């Protein structure tokens, strides 16, 4: 997928979502004032849980966000970070179509699979699990109140999940 195939806004949205697992609604609600470039952190209150979340800005999506801000974002008084591509400029209502279009253009098979930012949230959770990150930290990163919610995201990672289970004794073993 070349940079000519995707707008800077869409690239930044997908990179941010892919690496952080942020919900679509939180990306849409992200404001310029939520991004602390001096300390390289994004401060938000998650829409679904009302829990604060502080995400370190990684260079990969941070650079994509800066590229969008400097080269493509419309010059206007709107505080939302990601805006519609055409006037009147306003906050986005969803990122589903953006992510779906980019995933399709990249040739990712989506039949029978999750699409949109939920696919990226599952990927973030599974990647963290494979790296040995403890469940409470994964829950925190995804902004879940309850670790049971995180388990839904991890249940698709069968190989890693099965390595974490304790072996059960065979039936009839009295030891």
What is the role of each PLM region?
Residues 1-175:
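Conserved catalytic core of the tyrosine transesterase superfamily
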């Amino acid at each position: 997928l070349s940079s000519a195939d995707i707008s800077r806004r869409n690239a930044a949205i997908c990179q941010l979502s892919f690496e952080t697992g942020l919900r679509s609604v939180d990306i849409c609600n992200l404001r310029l004032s939520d991004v602390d470039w001096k300390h390289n952190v994004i401060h938000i209150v998650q829409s679904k849980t009302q829990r604060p979340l502080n995400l370190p800005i990684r260079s990969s999506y941070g650079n994509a966000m800066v590229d969008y801000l400097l080269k493509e974002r419309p010059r206007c008084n709107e505080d939302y970070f990601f805006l519609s591509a055409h006037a009147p400029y306003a906050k986005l209502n969803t990122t589903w179509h953006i992510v779906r279009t980019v995933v399709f253009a990249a040739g990712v098979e989506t039949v029978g699979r999750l699409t949109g930012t939920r696919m990226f949230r599952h990927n973030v959770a599974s990647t963290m699990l494979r790296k040995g990150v403890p469940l409470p930290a994964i829950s925190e990163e995804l902004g879940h109140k309850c670790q049971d919610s995180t388990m839904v995201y991890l249940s698709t990672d069968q190989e890693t999940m099965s390595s974490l289970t304790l072996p059960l004794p065979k039936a009839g073993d009295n030891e």
